Amino acid sequence: MRIVVLVLISALAAGCSRDHARADVPFDAKGFVLATNQSAIADVDLGLMAARRGRRPETRQLGSILHRQEGELRRALITLAQRKQIAVPEVPEPRKIALRENLEMLPGEVFDRGYALAMVQDLDAMTASFRQAAASNDPELAAFAKQNLPHIREQRALAAQLLKKLGGSPFS
């Protein structure tokens, strides 16, 4: 059973990385909008799942916070995307669907740990892409990123705190 849990958590970790959010790549406004939308769709959905399924109150609280704040972020992003004439999809990307399916299989505190790990990794990637957007030459996206970075950092801190309470990452 322990091996199965480690394999599932490894799959979660692999599904959460965002290699395209590196700082050495020139800023792509459309790419930022699309990637942020995809992440927000998944975070809203996973947040609701965690709010309902979390074993610990901290997991349910983190899920509720992410569900609410990422929903607000996504609504603001959609408005911005419409002004920029960027069509945003309404469905999550395949790896986020796989992440959800993997999390659905996990019981109790194993779910809590997997969710916390996935959120730490996702929010690390979001922080990197939002920093890049905040430093970009696009004034609207820079303002959007600067406005939302504090919320993302708070969410990341809560997820990291929860992960630490649950024994930390199995990879550290």
Show the residue positions of the predicted features.
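Sec-dependent bacterial lipoprotein signal peptides
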Residues: 1-14
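His/Met- and acidic-residue-enriched segments that coordinate or traffic transition-metal cofactors
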Residues: 16-172
